[in-house]
A protein has these predicted regions:
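N-terminal twin-arginine translocation
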Residues: 19-30, 40-66, 280-281, 287
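N-terminal secretory signal peptides
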Residues: 1-26
Length: 287
């Protein structure tokens, strides 16, 4: 296994709330620094261990773009979830809900209890899979679902008419209908954008990987909110991934060395969320 890159650690003895803020600042600096260094070194690096097999069908990867003469996106976002260290605390869910002004039942990232091979259980966070071939995009009657060049699948709630066709098409059950107006919060009233959507009544909402944060080098709320460092935000172009505590890994090596898998990969949606499994864990049925 490729060891995480060493970075400044949070000083010991700080109050929990202060330590959390310091950790998030260090993580943000880490993401900005590593993205900048990696991008300057090689904008057309091999983007992941599985691209040899998928280059012909994934036009938003750096290799495929180079082969076709297309402009290479600066980033190709993905997520890595290390289930070996997930304790099911659901802080990822709560951090997301707080950031996006969601109600308790609106779980854009949901933690499932799964059964392992020994009959025990383990926790599995499930965000939007950010599919390279998203079924939800094809069925929307008004074009409210879009996919950016950097691989983010977003919803324009100003266009969405709430047909729920996208919900039926999503094999991951990662979309939610907004039955009520969003609760009052500090970010309201604010205009809704695909990068920072407002969960307006009568529309469909979903995880957007905190798309408004990424250009500033900030971590998604679920990543920074996870106390166990389970969630990594990764970039297939620069080939790095960073978690909340600030650990940085070479993405392709991290995936390869830990035999990363993708949920329901057999469906051909090419999800950009990778799971690292512990002993006896499998992405099968719920417990």
């Amino acid at each position: 296994m490729q060891p995480p890159t060493s970075h400044p650690q949070v000083p010991a003895g700080l109050p929990p709330d202060v330590a959390r803020e310091v950790s998030q600042v260090l993580s943000r600096r880490n993401l900005l620094a590593t993205l900048g260094v990696a991008a300057a070194g090689s904008a057309l690096a091999v983007v992941s261990y599985r691209d040899e097999a998928h280059a012909a069908t994934t036009p938003h990867t750096a290799k495929a773009a180079a082969a076709t003469g297309e402009t290479t996106p600066k980033h190709a976002w993905c997520m890595v979830i290390d289930l070996r260290t997930c304790d099911g605390c659901a802080m990822c869910t709560r951090s997301c809900q707080q950031r996006h002004g969601l109600r308790e039942e609106q779980t854009w990232i949901k933690v499932y209890s799964m059964e392992d091979s020994s009959g025990g259980t383990f926790a599995m966070p499930r965000p939007c899979m950010m599919c390279e071939d998203p079924p939800c995009l094809k069925v929307c009657p008004v074009g409210a679902t879009l996919r950016t060049d950097e691989g983010l699948v977003l919803v324009d709630t100003d266009t969405c008419v709430g047909s729920r066709a996208c919900m039926a098409a999503c094999p991951y059950e990662a979309r939610y209908f907004n039955w009520t107006e969003p609760p009052a919060s500090k970010r309201m009233p604010m205009p809704s954008t695909p990068q920072m959507p407002v969960a307006k009544k009568g529309t469909v909402g979903k995880c957007v990987l905190c798309a408004d944060r990424l250009p500033q080098g900030e971590l998604p709320a679920c990543v920074s909110g996870c106390p166990m460092g389970v969630l990594y935000i990764g970039d297939l172009v620069t080939d790095i991934a960073v978690n909340g505590p600030g650990n940085t890994v070479v993405l392709s090596e991290f995936l390869r060395d830990n035999d990363a898998v993708r949920y329901k990969e057999e469906l051909g949606t090419n999800p950009r969320v990778y799971y690292i499994l512990g002993h006896g864990q499998k992405l099968g049925g719920q417990a």
